[in-house]
Amino acid sequence: MSTLNIPFLLDTDTYKLGHPRMYPEGAKELRAYFTCRGPLFDDDQRIVVYGLRYAFDTILSRRITQQDIDEADKWLQQHGVANTIMEWPKDLWQIVVDKYDGYIPLQVKALREGSVIYPQVPVFEIVAREIDGDQFQYLVTYLETALMRIWSPMVTATKSAMVRAYLQKKFDNSVEDDAMFLLDSRLHDFGSRGVSSQETAMVTGCAHLTSFDGTDTMIAGWLATRYNDGKHIGTSVLATEHSVMTSWDQEIDAVKRAVEITPSGGICSVVADSYSYNNFLTQHLPIVAPLAQAKGILFVVRPDSGDPVQCVIDGLYACERAFGADVNAKGFKVIRGGAVIQGDGINVKKLFEIADAVEAAGFSAQCVAYGMGGGLLQKQDRDTLKVAIKLCAIDLGNGLEGRMKKPSDDISKTSLPGPFIVNNVSGRPQVYPAYGNVWEDTRFENNKLEIIWDCGPTDYIWETIDQIRKRIQREWANSVSQNNEVLSHQMELRLQQTAAAIRDKYPVGG
């Protein structure tokens, strides 16, 4: 999204520049993989894979140019401390431009977007090989810094999937079939202003749209539509803000104006706490309700301060008094033309708490929508899912050998020795070692790590957002919240063998 034309080869960490000269000489192939070492919540360890296509479009598919090399080289001349020249693999990248038309000479295998996985499952694997004498194997983790950033859309996609699954249960309990479509709009993205960059808003906002359709982050909807073969993704409604409300001498006049400009049969959301939320509910709502109902408008009350749970419940009871309510076939109250949206103080767990309170109060889940801003797009970091890219295998001339990290002081950072494959067993992802005679087993014919890049574009077909949505909903519904069988018996054995070899080499306290 930047107009600065940033040199692509500088989009890595400085220490990556020296790594090609630090790996063992004579290596023929190096492999590394991306994984999540932890879940979003301990009580639900499911994770949604998302963000790979954008990484493909902006990182893997970007062809290296002579200008990239020249600009990087010029800047790096003064990057070293004490006036030392910062050495970097300029020669390898020059070969990429001269012999490979700028295409990155790596292979990348990845899971399908929308896959529901658990910690330790590899999301993608980077395969770097020597090609016709060119030492590209040593570029195995050069792109790690840039590719690592898919952690952010993965966190957001996971949050939205988790919320949808929870609200699905509430809808099943309290909403009639003809109103089930409203589930798509129950979580609305309010996060664009609360993120650190335009790109973050677009990419993480698009991740939200893999489970819901409601968004005020229009650039996210634009990207989602582009990734949906042009079929529109992302909807919203007319809504006021505090600046609109406080511009009028009388707040009720602002409310009336909002209803006036809303098309008949439309939706109008009005922020209700500019002065007194209680006054809005008791004084303004009885006045505006008949005006909205006369136009067939759904009038949505939006509290924006105070206790989120209490604000929603108070709003529902006030709407019931002002608009009236009917009891549906499932025994829950449905307000006639009124609703509440809570967008302040919302995170995943708080949303669950509100949804429980709404059900306990006897209201149908369709009567409440939720807006999430920073809690959806920004309040997260790389450690939210504890993502990492680690070397997993090396070929020093005698075939691939597994490599792993196993720090004695923090076993949670243990990585997996490769190479490996991911297969679905009973509908759940499981990791197997891929070596020896393992390929003779028919279970391994459907490796879920598919080649998306092989020293250039392949015939891999990216799925649409609609297809990704269906995969998430299907796999989430068929998965369990916690899975203790992520690693196959064979992978556990491989892990134990490699760990034992490490202990022999580096005994704790030795």
Regions found by a protein language model. Name each.
Residues 31-99:
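N-terminal, Lys/Arg-enriched amphipathic/low-complexity engagement segments
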Residues 107-118, 122-124, 442-445, 450-452:
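Active-site and channel-lining beta-strand-loop segments
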Residues 77-108, 113-117, 129, 297, ...:
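Long alpha-helical, hydrophobic tracts
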Residues 2-33, 37-41, 96-105, 114-329, ...:
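Buried, small/hydrophobic-residue-enriched core segments of structured protein domains
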Residues 52-60, 72-76, 92-96, 100, ...:
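Generic structural signal of hydrophobic/aromatic residues within well-ordered alpha-helices
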Residues 2-62, 213, 217-219, 287-291, ...:
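Gly/Ser/Thr/Ala-enriched C-terminal appendages of enzymes
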Residues 268-270, 340, 370:
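Hydrophobic/aromatic residues located in beta-strands of well-ordered beta-sheets
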